[in-house]
Amino acid sequence: MSQDSVKSLQSTFKTVGVVGRPRNDSTLQMHKNIFHWLCEQGYQVLVENEIGKALNLSENHLASLDQIGQHAQLAIVIGGDGNMLSHARILCKYNTPLIGINRGNLGFLTDIDPKNAYAQLEACLNGEFFVEERFLLEAVVKRHGETVARGNAINELVIHPAKIAHMIDFHVYIDDKFAFSQRSDGLIVATPTGSTAYSLSAGGPILTPQLNAIALVPMFPHTLSSRPLVVDGNSKISVNFAEYNIPQLEISCDSQLALDICCNDVVHIQKSPYKLRLLHLHNYNYYNVLSSKLGWLKKLF
């Protein structure tokens, strides 16, 4: 994004949304502090309904997530990566840029350190940022040719049995060409953003955020030859299932939304039309994030 584009975006920051799911008093207090700080800076502030009510804010500051998407030019997510994922899946439909204050564990998507939150937010609101766009995946479940379920994911889509410790048999097609069959606990289909999440735990590769690629990672395959597969990001992936599988299957979207699948269904996966727009401060370095979050060694010399 050019500097002129950054200035143009920054100049639109009139209404700012504050969202999250505080699990303790200290996180709720941070929502309150950020709200009052933004008001002091002259911004119109919308706070997610549940949080605003907990803070006893007036009605004109309360809004649903969809209303924040419709009216805010920036949303601040206070929480961990899970909070970012759940809010971003909705806000990306409105092309709302997001920046996160990390109150979770890893914080791959929430850059701002809570100890320096005000200085870093001030820098962001003054235009000292760049925009990074990341693509989402869309899953469509077809039954006898009709769409019966649909969902988006920022990290990954996971096909798995609804019951624990059951294997399933399925075929995978890439762009209508047969790719492979598999007997396993399931299949992870991950974006570059999700390559450092569940996919990584299953032995998948790390994909840098700007790669136009999708990772297909088997879950406990019943073969020694199965390996993760990286395909072009514009690929259309289809999965169908053996009729003798257990009747209850699911596709999980970011481990937050589950779609039911029957054995005679076909799951179609491709890029979503929506994009996640993350704001990063100028000193953001993806490789530094990997090193600090994953415990990589520092330079030896």
Curated annotation (Swiss-Prot):
Pfam families: NAD_kinase, NAD_kinase_C. Belongs to the NAD kinase family. This is NAD kinase. It is an enzyme of class 2 (transferase). SUPFAM superfamilies: NAD kinase/diacylglycerol kinase-like. Disulfide bonds: none annotated. One of its GO terms (molecular function) is NAD binding. Its EC number is 2.7.1.23. The active site is at D81 (proton acceptor). Its cofactor is a divalent metal cation. GO terms for cellular component: cytoplasm. Keywords: ATP-binding, Cytoplasm, Kinase, NAD, NADP, Nucleotide-binding, Transferase. It is found in: Cytoplasm. The gene is nadK. NAD(+) binds at D81, G82, N155, E156, H166, R183, D185, T196, A197, Y198, S199, L200, S201, Q256. Involved in the regulation of the intracellular balance of NAD and NADP, and is a key enzyme in the biosynthesis of NADP. Catalyzes specifically the phosphorylation on 2'-hydroxyl of the adenosine moiety of NAD to yield NADP. Gene3D superfamilies: Probable inorganic polyphosphate/atp-NAD kinase, domain 1, Probable inorganic polyphosphate/atp-NAD kinase, domain 2. The keyword Chloroplast does not apply. GO terms for biological process: NAD metabolic process; NADP biosynthetic process. It catalyses: NAD(+) + ATP = ADP + NADP(+) + H(+).
